Amino acid sequence: MSKCIVFDRDGTLIKYVPYLKDPKQVELLPFVKEVIRAFKNKGYKLFLHTNQSSISKGLFSIEDVKLCNNRLIELLDLEFEIFNEICIAEDYDDITGYRKPSPKFGKEILQKHSIIPENLVYIGDSILDIQTGLNLNCKVFGVKTGIDLRKFENHFFYTKYFYNDLVQIKNRIIQK
């Protein structure tokens, strides 16, 4: 049976930059490349889910976000396809239903890839990421690399697994 991991982007895989629209500002967080490689080598399907409401506010375009996503993939510099799918939630008012903490994208992954919730992992740096995973009844991991750290620590009870970086999360997931 397939196993899947959904990653948040900003603050989880790349350094948080407010209103990121310039691919030159995309910077991988430590160990991201090694962690992605390890999960792919273990057969995990990987997905990216990012809230980008600034698109609907007119601050930047969907193309800007796609260019930043492409830069992330370029920086990973891996010899295989990294993400099975990428979801960009661009609506501030969630017209499409994809804005976190909505479980819509995760439910589509479960259905499309014949996954059970127990084989889906959601990893992020914010309360919205954790709530999204909880709404999916899947495994949830918080990483202390984003800007929501203080809020996140106040809500540590939202997840059983809360770690300093992605390496600690990878070790916890792969050891099972």
Task: Please identify what each model-predicted range represents.
Residues 69-88, 152-173:
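Structural recognition of alpha->loop->beta junctions
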